[in-house]
Amino acid sequence: MAADGGMFESSRSIEEKRESKRRARQELLSKAKDDYSKAEKRKEQQRLRGEDTWMLDDVNDRLEALNQEHSAKNKKKKEKHRHKLKKEKKKKSKKQKSERNDDSEDSSSDSEEEWVEAPPLQAASEKKAWKIKAEVKAEVPEKSTERDEWMTLDFMSLKATSAAAMRAEKQKEKTLEHEKAQAAETEKLLSRELNPYWKDGGTGLPPKEGDVTSVKKLQHVEDGGLSWLRKSYQRMKEQSERENRSLDDIVAERYGSMEDFQRKLEAAEQAASQNSNDGQRERWKKSHSQDDEFRRYPRSSQHTDDNSRPRHTDHNRYNKYSHKESQEYKHSEESSRYRKEPEHRRQSFEDRNQDKSVSFKPKNPFLKPSDDDGRSLNIRDYKSLKNKVTGVQDSSKPCFQKPLSNEDEISWKKVPSKDCSEKKQQQSQDSEKPFFHKPSGSEGELSWKKIQPKYCSEKKQESQKEDSVSKERKGSREQTEPDAYSRESQSVKERPQSPRPDRSPQPIRILSDEEMNKLGAKIVKAELLGNMDLASKLRAQLEEARQQKERKSQGTSPVSERRSEAEESNLNKDNEVLLVRTDQSGRAWPVNAAADSMEPKGGRRKRQMVATHVDKERVRYFHDDDNQSLQDMVKREKMGTSEDQNKQFLRMASKFMEKTDRDYYTLDDMFVTKAAKKEHTDKEEERERMQAMHEHRSLTATMEKCRFCFDNAELPKHLIVAIGTKVYLCLPNHLSLTEGHCLIVPLQHHTASTLLDEDIYNEIQVFRKALVRMFESKGLDCVFLESNIYARKRLHLVYECIPLPKEVGDMAPIYFKKAIMESDEEWSMNKKLIDLSTKDIRRAVPKGLPYFSVDFGLQGGYAHVIEDEHKFPSYFGKEIIGGMLDLEPRIWRKAVRERFEDQRKKVLEFAQWWKPFDVTKE
């Protein structure tokens, strides 16, 4: 067994492994639960201690004052706006008054030039003025004595109505209006309803089997709404012709869009095909046993031993009606149905039956075949038999016959019932009429077959010839698939005027590169074999596929042009994002939008070489030198970084190392050749967009996790001591290096002092001077540290103030100078030590470079440009101070957490120190 190389394991060992996995999984789950419970317990304890709510009273007052100032500013803005509106209204009214006065002055300009004495008032009336006033006064009380109608109204006779009754009345009116609207809507729907079981108060379902009308009504049910949709499409088409409007607009009004209507039509066709498939399985099993010579089952090539077994019992079991009963039932049902139909319905039904090929024909489910249908073998035999039994019927009424069984072809046709002579004369028109075919078995096998009667053998041979002729005319359209869905789709394809709506062209499938390569291989193979016709066809197909791919890359596909435009407009409305990139100095500029490139995307293509020399003289180095102006080159140089140059260098060196081993081909030649190769026009823009998206995501994640941003919920409020307009003063959230260790932090997210605005930098200097005066009053010296190491991480700017004893503070410049000179790389590209005694950090260090700076009180200090960010420690300044004060390395190497009570004591003590020097209260 070992020689076979098989490794066997006992069930016990397998069970032990499973058990160990279960235990490990259980331990992990229990550990995760414990950690979660501990974290929740810690949060609850912090909440009970008041860590999330407690803060200094001065800080609380300051926050309230800031809120009041903000609200006062908003009120002032609102009042100012309101006052402005009032002024504008007054100005408008004054203008209108002045215009009116001007008009009146213009009209009475002549009268103003002369003074005319007014006639005396007594001339108008002989009565004195005082008498007129008295009369007016006397008339006023007479008018007041007349009472209004409501005063004389008897309120006790009025009908009292409560609020509940009024509400009930309103609700009743609303329900009545709703019922009226619903009734009107149902009337409209019933007028358009094509389902006969919904009309005249129907339930939508067919009646029981005992009802006579159930047989005919089955023609309009179980089709999934297909007939209704086709009729609706016909009406929409007629409406478009009548109103001279576009068909797409009318379809969009009713169904939303043509695509939605087509989707519903396809779903209805699938449902109808499934229903017809299920129904035909039961119907075609039924046969009729009036004459044994007409009832025999097929003989299969694989089951020849079963042919001798009688099948009379099977036939008798499915036989339900005799020939005469079936014909009488059909005539009585049709006559009663015809009498019940209204006049316009009867006329429309006759018109539809007279011209089925022109009008829309809903998919009728095939009813149970009668005895004469089962006895028929072809169209001619059916007519002769029917004339013997039932006499001559109306020739305009179509009939559906059960299909014939034939080794070569099985077909049954729907034709008008006419004489055999007329059938021969109209044989040339049979190919234009719809054919319904029953699928045959594979390789000529038939699942059922009927033996034709002796007196119809000659007619059957003639019909077979006619069927073969019609089959040749149909050509490749005839298919024999075994499912009902293919049968229905074939019948729809063969109709001369399909009721299917005029669909928009289906979206063409774009060939992939692999498929196009296979197509090219077929072209080569056809050319080698000498089949030039096939090669030309395949070549045209390949060219068309390439054009479609180019159209898709350009976004101008004619198939989905309208849909793509709508989707793009929706996307532009919903997701409009401005991508920006930030350079070393903190300036941001927008990234160019994506341009529609004419070059196809995907696949590996050889990059074309650009001519770099003309007459043995170099005219360009890079492929885009002709498109770059001096302004563009300066812009790219200022906005680019050293990382961009390194990435470009790596891209040029990555995929061109295969030729370096050849003679006379050096590394310089490789870069020169690589630079001269033409790149895709949109590659650089795509690269910039991806870089901008990456920067935006990283900045968003950094700002969400930042514990120093004033708007962040995780900011430790209990450590804040003072709040200014642009910066705030707080204590560290860990064990302090010395007593009085504090931080000056901007309110907003800023990364370095070299990128600060003027007002923020000035306020930091104000806090710095106040802290120096505070520590001087305590007999201490102080050192200010700032580390801007990881510029790409965009960390929050923190300006640390660490108090020192006087004797240690005097020696601090010597310690820091020596440490800076020995730090970082031995050979540096920038100056090792930068003196800040004569200029501040903003003028000493270029923007965007990582640096470390130290200031000693109000004096200047030193700065150092960091060469290697990975080798320079983030605790560099604290390490020097810890060495000067002989502190434990754990204090400055890794932040040591403190209890809330210790932090609160520390904050209260520092607040007492800070209170006399608080610059925020001035």
Swiss-Prot record:
Residues 102-116 have a biased composition (Acidic residues). Residues 12-52, 167-191, 288-355, 369-384, 410-435, 456-503, 540-553, 560-574 have a biased composition (Basic and acidic residues). Residues 12-106, 165-278, 525-557, 673-706 form a coiled coil. The lineage of its organism: Eukaryota, Metazoa, Chordata, Craniata, Vertebrata. This is CWF19-like protein 2. PANTHER family: CWF19, CELL CYCLE CONTROL PROTEIN, CWF19-LIKE PROTEIN 2. Keywords: Coiled coil. Belongs to the CWF19 family. Pfam families: CwfJ_C_1 (PF04677), CwfJ_C_2 (PF04676). Residues 1-130, 164-220, 261-513, 540-574 are annotated as: Disordered. Residues 73-95 have a biased composition (Basic residues). The keyword Methyltransferase does not apply.
